[in-house]
């Protein structure tokens, strides 16, 4: 028999890298077509006028203009690009 306890293993000791999510262009900012507006998981913000949605739910500008945050249907947050 061993005279000392063996070192135990642990299931902790790792962490994932930050994914840099969030708003990248704020309300009132001037943007050009293709600029990323928001990186998100799921549709926290929905795409509005002149805004496209990528397969990972990234919202991006389709035209040049000014960013405007708004509500669609009174409850759902959305983002528009105003000319």
Curated annotation (Swiss-Prot):
NCBIfam families: L27. Keywords: Chloroplast, Plastid, Ribonucleoprotein, Ribosomal protein. It is found in: Plastid, Chloroplast. GO terms for biological process: translation. The keyword Chloroplast applies. Residues 1-21 are annotated as: Disordered. GO terms for molecular function: structural constituent of ribosome. Belongs to the bacterial ribosomal protein bL27 family. InterPro entries: Ribosomal_bL27, Ribosomal_bL27_CS. This is Large ribosomal subunit protein bL27c. It holds the Pfam family Ribosomal_L27. The gene is rpl27. GO terms for cellular component: chloroplast; mitochondrial large ribosomal subunit. PROSITE patterns: RIBOSOMAL_L27. PANTHER family: LARGE RIBOSOMAL SUBUNIT PROTEIN BL27M (PTHR15893:SF0), RIBOSOMAL PROTEIN L27 (PTHR15893).
